[in-house]
Amino acid sequence: MNVFLSKYVNGVDKKSRVSVPANYRAVLGQELFNGVIAYPSIRNKCIEACGISHIEKLRQMIETLDPYSEERDAFETIIFGEALQLSFDSEGRVMLPQSLMQHAGIEEQACFVGKGVIFEIWQPQNFEKYLNSAQKIAYEKRLTLRNAN
């Protein structure tokens, strides 16, 4: 399966290493790079992570924008300029850079949240707050999915 699913909370050690869930690594294992691309989320106070193939799709979408627009410049700066290639070690861990940890408020634990083609890495309590608001929105907008086809 090529989809990031489920939620996991893993500890972050003193060297800022965290184990990426095994099923996420399996999805990423289909990529050319043995690791993950991580960048600050532009939607939430979390880290977004994906494989090289998704970054390529984002690049193609961003390139459709006016090359001199503020929007394109902002997307390129945040997504590409702030993105980091995080390699897996022999135990399936990555080292989270301090800049990304600070952006997400991550200290001792990281909450991995599957979102289909990407996954997010949250500070666990912040994710629980977000989950409550997301549940309300999903309930209110549930009929939207009926018309998705």
From Swiss-Prot:
Disulfide bonds: none annotated. The keyword Transcription applies. It is found in: Cytoplasm, Nucleoid. Its main location: cytoplasm. Residues 7-54, 83-126 form the SpoVT-AbrB domain. It holds the Pfam family MraZ. InterPro entries: MraZ, MraZ_C, MraZ_dom, MraZ_N, MraZ_sf, SpoVT-AbrB_dom, SpoVT-AbrB_sf. CDD domains: MraZ_C, MraZ_N. It comes from the Bacteria. GO terms for cellular component: cytoplasm; nucleoid. Forms oligomers. This is Transcriptional regulator MraZ. It comes from Rickettsia canadensis (strain McKiel). The gene is mraZ.
